[in-house]
Design a protein with these regions (language model features):
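Bacterial N-terminal signal peptides
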Residues: 9-20
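C-terminal outer-membrane/trafficking sorting elements
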Residues: 2, 21-25, 517-526, 530-603
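Residue-level detector of alpha-helical transmembrane segments in integral membrane proteins
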Residues: 14-15, 136, 520-522
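C-terminal PAP-associated
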Residues: 26-508
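Extreme N-terminus of proteins, especially the signal/transit-peptide cleavage junction
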Residues: 51-58, 515-520, 541
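Low-complexity, intrinsically disordered segments with a bias for serine/threonine
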Residues: 13-14, 437, 534
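Low-complexity, Pro/Thr/Ser/Gly/Ala-rich linker/spacer regions in secreted
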Residues: 503-519
Length: 603
């Protein structure tokens, strides 16, 4: 494996030399270069190691998804079942170069994140069962979910494969479907399993003759309106046609931001694409389908540095001419890294399905990384003035890195982001609005330790920096916002963390988290409220050393208990809390399988 790593390192150097940016306007080749640098993965597990650095906990109640210490974890996506708010799914990039692992694990919960199960589906095993001869997985990303009204779940991901003997590549976007809540996944046979296939010509900086073309940054949503297009599954993305397709005069040519459709009861995506952008360089798209069936799409126009927005009311067969709703700075040819090598406009869109209010946030990269926000209260006809997220948060001197936005059906909106100082150090934050995004409450820190992005800068051209990903995501269910992000606090490479904030709860500045694992479950915390004794009921698949601590709402430790080795099975333990004063607290349970937190009341 070390030989492959060295070869890959040299391969990246060759890529940089082959696709050197020209000294003129940004072009399609520059965009392809940007895609190559994003999708090719070398990994960081052998570059950054510091296993002696403990992860401190101070009661903020955020937690790592897994007990993984070797792999990079990045680009997390979280979704909730629109017809069952207790049903959640998460996936992310999981890259462990030493173990030759590059997959997208799927975790699902049927109890609002109290317990988690891992799907049996392995994207890498599936791909390797039916590979392109002579091609190995060299990168990929973009794990995305969507639900339909019948409870079916759709999943898409992409792989970049390479033949290292001749520099040929394959760029394939795959999709699957689950009808059992995410436990198992069905994949179509033959070419039906591909949403799009293409390849990159590493010597010209364009596409090659394979397939139909490159389809990057796929984003899913489905029509759940009950209208004439109910059940349609839509996917937006950047499309660059293959050289073969580009020369085919018998088909309508599309390029830039496009939409692909899968109709209900059809087992494949249509081969056609609907043009959204006006032939411009377009990337970083998001799609949402409103409760009336209107399709909302937002993307970045690279050359004009504009946030563009468009809608479709005919099921994605056509789109209105895009309108400009904001600006950003982003030079895809720049070699200057401000925070992380994957900094990008990172557009994120949310809808309030009760009134179809539309909210959008994004990054602008100039001499610092800024976060911007706008919203529409008339289904995208007009937009409010763009606002600076750092200013809204009360921290105008801070950078806002990779913001994302979520909304419920009650005029409540949340924005999550990395708030970084001038040295690129900071916490992952969230702030909340209860009046449709007009006014914002004081931000809350979701992470209980800072990430120092400056420590992850790589100067050796034969190494890639650790993978944090191109975006993070969040979803809002009633009062609760679930946020997932890639956290680099322990200098052992980025790891996925998740937090759940209930903005209706009296403990509005804390979260409840359950580690995403099948090895430990906290079945019950009782009585709650409690005066003297608190009981915790565990279910363990195997023995574990468990430590329990209690923190106040300021994050200060008020009570800790001796670490106890608890055997496998269902076990109940009691904890004396008579000495702490009556108030609201967070109890934190640490195990080798992850961390669990719960809110408690001492009477």
């Amino acid at each position: 494996m070390q030989l492959k790593q060295n070869f890959l390192s040299s391969f990246i150097v060759i890529l940089i030399l082959l696709i050197a940016p020209p000294a003129n306007a940004q072009s399609q080749n520059d965009l392809i270069d940007h895609i190559i640098k994003e999708k090719f993965r070398i990994g960081s597990s052998q570059v950054f190691t510091n296993e002696d650095s403990p992860i401190s906990k101070n009661g903020k109640a955020e937690s790592k998804l897994t007990n993984n210490s070797a792999a990079d974890e990045a680009e997390p996506f979280i979704i909730v079942n629109p017809n069952d708010s207790s049903h959640l799914l998460i996936s992310y990039i999981n890259l462990d170069l030493a173990s030759e692992i590059f997959n997208f694990p799927i975790y699902y919960s049927n109890d609002s994140g109290q317990t988690w199960n891992k799907s049996s589906f392995d994207t890498q095993e599936f791909y390797l069962d039916d590979p392109f001869p002579g091609f190995e997985i060299a990168g990929g990303g973009d794990p995305i979910f969507a639900f339909d009204n019948d409870g079916n779940i759709y999943f898409t991901w992409l792989y970049l494969a390479a033949n290292f003997s001749n520099f040929e590549t394959r760029f394939v976007v795959l999709w699957g479907q689950s009808s059992d809540g995410g436990a198992t996944w069905g994949i179509q046979e033959g070419d039906k399993k591909y949403l799009e296939t293409g390849g990159l010509d590493l010597f010209t900086g364009g596409t090659n003759e394979f397939g139909t073309g490159v389809f990057d940054r796929p984003w899913f949503d489905s029509d759940r309106s009950g209208g004439p297009h109910d059940g349609n599954l839509y996917c937006t993305g950047l499309f660059i046609p293959s050289t073969t397709l580009a020369m085919d005069t018998t088909v309508e040519q599309t390029a830039g931001m496009v939409l692909k459709r899968k109709l209900p009861s059809v087992d494949s995506f249509e081969t056609s694409r609907t043009q959204i952008s006006n032939g411009d360089l377009a990337q970083f798209g998001n799609i949402k389908v409103a409760n009336n069936g209107t399709i909302h799409v937002v993307y970045g126009n690279i050359n004009d540095q504009e946030v563009r927005y468009s809608t479709s009311i005919d099921g994605g067969l056509s789109f209105e001419p895009p309108s400009t709703i904001g600006q950003f700075s982003f030079d895809i040819m720049s070699t200057i890294i401000l925070v992380n090598d994957r900094e990008n406009p990172a557009l994120s869109m949310a809808l309030d399905y009760s009134n179809n209010n539309t909210y959008i946030v994004w990054n602008s990269i100039d001499d610092r990384v800024s976060g911007l926000y706008t919203y529409s209260q008339d289904e995208g006809v007009t937009w409010k003035d763009v606002q600076d997220i750092a200013t809204l948060s009360g921290m105008p001197d801070h950078q806002v890195y990779l913001p994302n936005i979520a909304s419920n059906d009650n005029n409540e909106v949340s924005i999550s982001w990395y708030s970084l100082d001038s040295l690129d150090v900071g916490n992952y934050m969230i702030m909340h609005s209860r009046d449709g995004g007009k006014n914002w409450e004081t931000p809350i820190s979701l992470s209980d330790a800072v990430t120092d992005f400056s420590e992850y800068i790589v100067t050796n051209p034969q190494q890639q920096p650790p993978i944090f990903g191109d975006y993070f995501t969040s979803v809002k269910v009633g009062c609760t916002t679930y946020s997932v992000w890639s956290d680099g606090r322990d200098m052992n490479g980025p790891k996925i963390y998740v937090s759940a904030n209930n903005f209706c709860n009296v403990l509005s500045n804390t979260s409840e988290i359950t580690a995403i694992t099948e090895d430990i479950q906290l079945r019950s915390v009782y009585p709650n409220p409690s005066k003297h004794i608190l009981y915790l009921e565990y279910n363990l698949k195997k023995q574990s050393d468990i430590s329990v601590s209690i923190y106040n709402t300021d994050g200060k430790l008020v009570q800790s208990y001796l670490t106890e080795s608890i055997p496998a099975g269902t076990q109940t333990r009691s904890y004396d809390i008579h000495s702490i004063i009556p108030a609201a607290y967070t109890i934190l349970i640490n195990s080798e399988f992850g961390t669990i937190t719960r809110k408690i009341i001492k009477q």
